[in-house]
Structure formats: C-alpha cells, structure tokens
C-alpha cells in the first residue's frame, strides 16, 4: 500500500488497522517490544530507578520526560523547582511531561504538572492533546482530571481523531468511554479522516457500542 507524502500511519492504525495489508510497514512496529520493556521496568528495584536517573542527570529535559512517564513524582517536583519551564518541555515527537504522565496513567504526576503550569492543550506533532493520550490508553481517572481542568473533549488530531474515537477503539477503555459520553458538550457524531464516527469504531472493534445510547439526547435525564 502506498501512502502520500506526510501520511501518518499511526492515525490509520487507530481507525482502520484491519484494512492494512499484512506486511505493510508500521510506524509503531516496536510496540510489543516496548510493552515487554514496560513489564520489566515494573519489576525493577528502587536502586534501578536511581541508576536510570543518574544516567540522565546531565540532561534535565530528558530526565523530566522520563520521570513523568515512570511516575517518579519526587524527581518531577525537584526538576520543576529548579527550572519551572521543564513542565512544558517536549520530546522529538512533541510529547510533554503531561502527555507522558497521561498515557502512563500517573494521576499524582498529572495533578502536580497541572498545578505547576503544564499546558493542558499542548499538542504533539500529530495533534494529540494529553486527553487524547489518556483516552487512547483507557485511563479514566486521568481523563476525568484533565476534563475538570478544562481540556477540550471534542479536540481533534491531525487525522481528525477525537478522544472519544480513541477510547471507542480500545476494548479496555470502558470507563473512559462512559466518562466521555457523559460530557454535556460532547459531539459524539464527529467523523475522523476516514469518515467514521466513534460509534462506527466501537461497533467494529469492541463490544461497547451500546454505550452510545448515553449520548442520545432523548435518553439523557437532567
């Protein structure tokens, strides 16, 4: 399959992964390896984490991003105290510490970063906000926190993906889907660049499509 210049295969994988021919090169082909690494890290000792921090001690930006992703709250607090601008630093893909803490599900780190001035509406190079990250990985508590702070529930990525569409495609994101569907300002019928709504995605990829009755005005009781 040939893609036009600048086409983002990650966006296609979120919506039409079943349509990509076997053998098509993926922009996320190391995901399984990364998952295995994450499992290994969860079993590491405190000494291991301290060694990892030592390796990054001369690069505060890298250390901040790493610490936010790995739930190292004390390290995040220390770095923010020494240089407040680090709460909005970015990696090469535009992910901020808030993005990383959001997709990793670290509520205390998320709250601290927001209290310290982290940009709630920061976008990656693909147009993802922290709410997109939390929704994609099914972290309902994080999504709830971001929404309470003012995150835009209908924000769209460069591929026109909404947080609802991302949650709709994840079988493990039931609570996140329920949360998003309960938002009064939600526009559940928005379509992505492939022309699909969140309901279409849920119908194809999960068993949660029945939840979309929540978003029908006639079923809402105020």
Identify what each model region corresponds to.
Residues 1-58, 219-222:
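Intrinsically disordered, low-complexity regulatory regions that flank or link repeat-based scaffolds
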Residues 57, 91, 124, 157, ...:
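Ankyrin repeat boundary/linker residues
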Residues 71, 105, 138, 171-172, ...:
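Ankyrin-repeat intra-repeat helix-capping/turn positions
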Residues 87, 120, 153, 187-188:
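Ankyrin-repeat inter-repeat connecting loop/turn
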Residues 181, 188-216:
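Leucine-rich solenoid repeat scaffolds
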């Amino acid at each position: 399959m040939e893609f036009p210049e600048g086409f983002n295969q990650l966006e296609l994988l979120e919506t039409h992964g079943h349509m990509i021919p076997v053998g098509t090169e993926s922009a996320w082909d190391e995901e399984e390896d990364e998952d295995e690494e994450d499992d290994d890290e969860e079993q590491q000792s405190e000494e291991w984490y301290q060694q990892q921090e030592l390796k990054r001690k001369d690069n505060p930006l890298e250390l901040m991003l790493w610490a936010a992703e790995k739930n190292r709250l004390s390290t995040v607090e220390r770095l923010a105290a020494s240089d407040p601008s680090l709460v909005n630093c970015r990696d090469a893909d535009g992910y901020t510490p808030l993005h990383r803490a959001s997709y990793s599900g670290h509520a205390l780190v998320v709250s601290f970063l927001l209290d310290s001035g982290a940009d709630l509406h920061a976008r990656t190079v693909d147009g993802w906000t922290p709410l997109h990250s939390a929704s994609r990985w099914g972290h309902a508590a994080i999504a709830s926190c971001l929404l309470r702070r003012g995150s835009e529930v209908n924000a769209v990525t460069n591929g026109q993906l909404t947080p609802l569409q991302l949650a709709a495609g994840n079988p493990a994101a039931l609570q996140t889907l329920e949360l998003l569907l309960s938002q009064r300002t939600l526009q559940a019928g928005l379509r992505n660049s492939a022309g699909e709504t969140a309901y279409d995605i849920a119908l194809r990829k999960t068993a949660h499509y029945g939840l979309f009755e929540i978003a029908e005005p006639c079923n809402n009781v105020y």
